[in-house]
C-alpha cells in the first residue's frame, strides 16, 4: 500500500488546491501517469503516480485544499500494509546499542505500502495545490509514470511514481492544498491492501527506512516504505539521486554530473548551493547568495491589519486563485517595505520607429518578431551597466547593498491567472534580435504556465508594459527585493515641438519607480535620461 503525500517543493508554498483528478477510486494507474492537477500560488502542477497500482482512496476532492504532508492518494501497489508514519518529535540522546547484522528483506505475504510524501525541494516552497490526478484508487501504476500535477508558487509539477504498484489512497483531492511532508499517495506492493494499512500494528524495532520519492517534476526525494506485516524489513534504497529541480537544471547547464555531488539537504538531497559549490563561476553563485537575505527579512516588516468582512446585501463570493494570492502577498510585502518614488518622462521615438521598420524584414527572415520591447530592454541593460546601483538589492537587517555583477532582466507578463514575472538570465549578453526572441518565447511559456522555478527567481531589474492595456503612465510596484522597475506606456502619435516647429511625433511614456532608501530622485533622473538618450538614438544600441 502506497500513501502518496503532498511534498514541500520550496518557495514558501504550504498548500495547493486540487483542480482535477484523472483517476477515481478503483482505477488502475501506471507509474508516471498524471494522477491529479494541483494549483499553487505560482503554477498548476501535474502530479505523476510514483508507483503502479490501484487507487484505493483520494485524499481530497476537486476544489479542496491540500497541505504539505497530507495524503493525496492511497494506491494499492501490491506491496503490503503501511505502518503509521513516524511523527516529528524531539530526539533525545540515543542509548548505545550493539551493532546488528544487516537484515535481508524477506518476502511479506501481506505486501508493503509505499508512503509517497510531498517533498521539500528548497526555494521556500512549502505547499502546493493538486491540479490533476492521472490515476485513481485501485489503478496499477508503473515507476516513472506521472501520478499527479501539483501547482506551486513557481511551477506546475508533474510528480512521477517512484515505484510500481497499486494506488490504495490519494492523499488529497483535486483542488486541495498539500503541504511538505504530507502523504501524496499510498502505493501498495506485493498484494498490500488499504485495510492492512489501517490495521493496528504491534510495536516492533525501528529499522532503516527505504528512501522513496516525493517528487516535483523529475526530483526524487526521501520517503518511508512501510512493512506490510509485523516483521521488520530492511528494504534496499532506490539508488536514485535526490535533488531539487533547480539543482538538476543548474547541474545540466554547468555540465556537472549530479550523481557525484554530496547533497546538503534533508536526507542528502542535492540543492542549488551544492551544485554551485561543486563547479560554478562566481557569476552563477551570486544570484542565490545575494537575493535570499533580503527576502528572509521581508515577512517581519509587513504590517498586520483586520480583514474586510463580508458586506451585507446581495454579493457574489469569488475565491481568488493561488496565483492571485501570491501576487497579493508580493504586492503587500513590497509596498510595506519599500518607500518608492516614481519619475516620469515622455520621449520622441520617431527615430526608433523608423529604425525598427527598417530592421523588421531582416528579423523576419531569421524567424524573429521584432518588437519595441527588444529595443527598450537593450537600452535598459546598457543603462544598468552604467548605473549598477539599479541592479542591486538591499538587506535592511544588515544595512548591506548587494550590487550584482550579472543582469537577470525581469519581464512582467499578464496571464489569464494573474501577473507573473519571469526573467531572462544574463540578458546583458544578448543582442537586440536575441532579446526579441527570448522575450517572445518567455511570454508564451509564461502564459501557458510552462516556465520553471529557475526562470522566476533571481531577477535583478524588471520592466512592466502597461502600454499593452492602452495606458500611458503608471506607478509600477517594485518587484522586491529589487530596487527599481521601469514601466512602459503605449506608443502614441501627438503634437511635439521639434526646433521651432510643432510636428506629429511618435511618443513613448516612461515611468521609473525606485527604492528611495537607496536610490535618490536625482539618480533616478539620470538613469531615465540615459535610457531616453539610447531610445531617441537607436543606433547607439548597436555600439554597446
Swiss-Prot record:
Domain Peripheral subunit-binding (PSBD): 242-279
Cofactor: (R)-lipoate
Entry annotation: catalytic residues: 516
Cofactor, how bound (note): Binds 2 lipoyl cofactors covalently.
Keywords linked to the UniProt accession: Acyltransferase, Lipoyl, Repeat, Transferase
Catalysed reactions listed for this entry: N(6)-[(R)-dihydrolipoyl]-L-lysyl-[protein] + acetyl-CoA = N(6)-[(R)-S(8)-acetyldihydrolipoyl]-L-lysyl-[protein] + CoA
Molecular function GO terms recorded: dihydrolipoyllysine-residue acetyltransferase activity; lipoic acid binding
Subunit structure: Forms a 24-polypeptide structural core with octahedral symmetry.
Family assignment from sequence similarity: Belongs to the 2-oxoacid dehydrogenase family.
Name the record gives this protein: Dihydrolipoyllysine-residue acetyltransferase component of pyruvate dehydrogenase complex
Gene source species: Acholeplasma laidlawii
Gene designation: pdhC
